[in-house]
Amino acid sequence: MDDVTILATGLGFPEGPVACPDGSVVLTEIRHARCSRVTPDGRVSAFSDCGGGPNGLAIGPDGGFYLCNNGGSRYVGGHSMGMGPHPDYRHGSIQRIDPKTGEATLLYSHVDGQPLSAPNDLVFDTAGGFYFTDLGKRYARHRDHGGLYYAQPDGSSIVTLAYPMLSPNGCGLSPDGRTLYVADTEGARLWAFEVQGPGRLKPKLEFAPHSGRVV
């Protein structure tokens, strides 16, 4: 692959790259509990000391960065993935990061009275709200369920769309905004949900966990 250029090395589990107008890329470093900026010439600088386990990142309609924070994981030598929650783990969260200062502000830590477990990825719709996945947390003998949610960027509203799900990871909308795709990593499935309006999915059938169909 001669057409691939390595711009930066030494990043701690990089995720959620966002291309910025100035040509730089802002990304998350889950293992280092921060967001970093990489310039076109490969220079890396700290952007936000957001803490926890910063995961998915996206620019919102107001120009701010919106972050899925999984709360932090425990890493063991020989394993690239987290092996349970970090000792300081309390819950996951959704944060807004100021694009100028890098200051992180908490938007959501709970839904329906329950703590978020490990928010993973998000995507904005044309109405200005965003869908996001919660991967759940894996423990030695059990795990928290994952789920799919919809929220407003001003912190005013968060609703559950699908719960429980095994391990919802990446998510994205079709070009016409009528289909929401969700990758289920451990289930080795790609789910497609029919979008009937901002934050509204096709109702599920009785006894079904959600209304998604396998692609």
For the regions a language model picked out, list residue spans one by one:
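Sequence-structural signature of mature extracellular/luminal beta-sheet repeat domains
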Residues: 1-215
